[in-house]
Amino acid sequence: MVKQSPEKLVKELETYENTPEFFYSIRSLDQQPGLHALTDIQRAARIIYLNRTCFNGLYRVNSQGYFNTPFGQYKHPVIANKPVIMAVSEYLNTANVKIVCGDYSIVLKQLPSDAFVYLDPPSHHGNFIVHLLYP
């Protein structure tokens, strides 16, 4: 939605509140059947909002796949960062960018030899996924 409808996305984000009550109502949507009824704009805004207002911007889900990072308690988070959203939209619309979600072993075989690739696999440590693992 950043690429196709940045203005609509910003407008949606501007309605979002920085309160624990609003945060937890948005966070809990993935536990309700209504999540699938949201528009693409609303789903994109939800992810951006949660990232900007949750603790340390940490995207984390529990074993059931539900987002479970707590409210970040920031005094003035920038939820609807219009200049950044517009700049990213312009870049995505003018550059040859392809964002892919898939098995890395398959995706890598489909790329040209001069492609820039970023892979972000989880690091497993016992029964817990470690977000940063240093040697």
Put a short name on every predicted segment:
Residues 2-118, 122-130:
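SAM-dependent nucleic-acid methyltransferase catalytic core
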Residues 132-135:
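Glycine-rich S-adenosyl-L-methionine
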